[in-house]
Design a protein with these regions (language model features):
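Terminal accessory/targeting
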Residues: 1-13, 35, 112-187
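Metal-dependent polysaccharide deacetylase catalytic core of the NodB/CE4 family, i.e.
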Residues: 1-79, 89, 102-109
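Residues that line or immediately flank small-molecule/substrate-binding pockets and catalytic motifs
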Residues: 72, 95, 112-115
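Acidic, His- and aromatic-enriched active-site or binding-groove loops in soluble protein domains
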Residues: 88-97
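Short histidine
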Residues: 97, 103-107, 116-117
Length: 187
């Protein structure tokens, strides 16, 4: 978040440090100006967050990042559209998973590797993971209005493990999954 860099907040890199990384060939990505919960903001406010951030990168580094990470990993269809309009070529959520050809470039998964989830075992799990290739996900928008939601997806043609599929909820444990051919619906 460029605001944190501008304010020289403790624990954040400075513009000078970012320039050093850039000069050494590292890629620099973006995450808005003030790091808000974007799905809660209006389209105009999100556009402003992205514009201000891009302007700060242009001023300080002479470039606009092409990659974006949603603050807190949160996004909606409206947020994705604004990120695309701002000129980014891809964006990352904060949901664990393996990217594959069925993922949209603006909903890429990433494994968190931090003090809580940064063990060697976790790194090995992430490196050796395989994608769950799905499409036709319902609901399309990850910001849900209905609780509990109706949720379903179709396994890609090269996935043949539908009978082994298990889904879990952090509060309720294992969920009932109805398998209808290649379609899975959580009920």
């Amino acid at each position: 978040a460029t605001q944190s860099v501008d304010r020289a907040l403790r624990g954040y890199m400075s513009w000078e440090q970012l320039r050093e990384l850039q000069a050494a060939g590292f890629g620099i990505g973006s995450q808005t100006h003030s790091h808000p919960h974007m799905h809660r903001l209006s389209v105009a406010k999100n556009r402003d967050e992205l514009t201000v951030s891009n302007e700060r990168f242009l001023t300080e580094l002479g470039m606009r990042p092409s990659l974006f990470a949603y603050p807190y990993g949160e996004y909606s269809i409206d947020v994705i559209n604004e990120v695309k309009q701002a000129g980014f070529i891809a964006a990352f959520g904060q949901h664990s998973g393996i990217a594959h050809g069925y993922d949209g470039f603006f909903e890429l998964p990433r494994f968190a590797m931090n003090e809580q989830y940064g063990s060697r075992d976790r790194l090995e799990l992430a490196i050796n993971g395989l994608p769950l290739k799905v499409n036709q996900i319902v609901p399309e928008d990850v910001v849900l209005a209905e609780n509990p939601p109706s949720y379903g997806f179709t396994l890609s043609g090269d996935m043949d493990q539908e009978r082994q599929l298990r889904c879990f909820n952090s509060r309720y444990g294992k969920l009932d999954v109805a398998i209808l051919g290649r379609r899975a619906e959580i009920r």
